[in-house]
Amino acid sequence: MKRMNKLLALLLAVIMVASFAACGNEPAPTPDPEPTPDPTPAITYPLTVTDMAGCEVTLEKEPERIVSGYYISSSACIALGLSDKMVGIEDKSAKRPIYKLAAPALIDLPNVGSAKAFDLEACVNANPDLVILPMKQKDTAQTLSEMGIATLLVLPESHEQLMEMFTLIGTTTNSMEKATALIEYYNAKLTAVAELTKDLTDEQKPVVYIGSTSDILRTAPKEMYQASLITTAGGKNAGDVLEGTSWTDIDNETFLTMNPDVIVIPTDNFAVSSPDYTAEDVLNNATFADVTAVKNGAVYQMPVGFEAWDSPVPSGILGTLWMLHTLHPELYTAEQFAADADEFYSTFYGFHVALDQAA
């Protein structure tokens, strides 16, 4: 627990830094020529794409007014350089640190409601030529389509589906150059993680239980994105015995039977505070006293301050890397994680971060 207390004491100090090229008196040596990358295919309109619900969506011209009713697609739009085209955004946007840091103008956009309660009137009044919604808003998407408003449905519940979402939005909005860069970054990091964990035996892969933000007795089934974070990082998801694509309630007996080696507590969905319970609450719960993770003090809380890294947002790759360090610190250090976090945010969101370990 001391190791992770140190990691969880990371001082998340955000530093807005302009990058300047270094100059010198001596001419720089001529580097070897780099291979010329394949050019990104040109997007032409009218354009027809197939969204993640299998529906064909046609756009007569490049979208200039985008509404995102889902924080996951909103974060993706920022990473793809589309924030200036957004004219409507999901509820409670002011609570999301990433918007304040990377695209503060989004906070003042019209509120179009949430994934659970979408405000159709507010969306239509924003006069969008493209709307992006979560899969659970199928009926709303149908209504908007019947009104002549192009609407994409997305469902990023795995690394592969997240890449599919980047490609879908990138293609539809003519931002494939940035989408390709993001996908290549993801794939490079996932390849590196696979290389680091390839020699782990089954016995070296801990059983990991991830709780929800509202209750320790809610966890992620095998089809949820959170499960993929665990397995990719060299662990075994305790919730793989459950079916479904949403947080699932269990009872004490099931939790005790799972007997995880590690327990992970995510930040809240706005990444501004801890969930409704803490690691200490779990460690001090007498009912859980015989659980391996509790006996060994292996109950860890994800960092707070930017985004919920256990969610399928672009920065979800940092959730995988954080999980890798948590489960296998001998393979991937806190210093490596800090460097990767800074690289990610500076590359795709335009600001630097410093994650300095407190003493």
Where are these regions (language model features)?
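Bacterial N-terminal signal peptides that target proteins for export
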Residues: 1-11
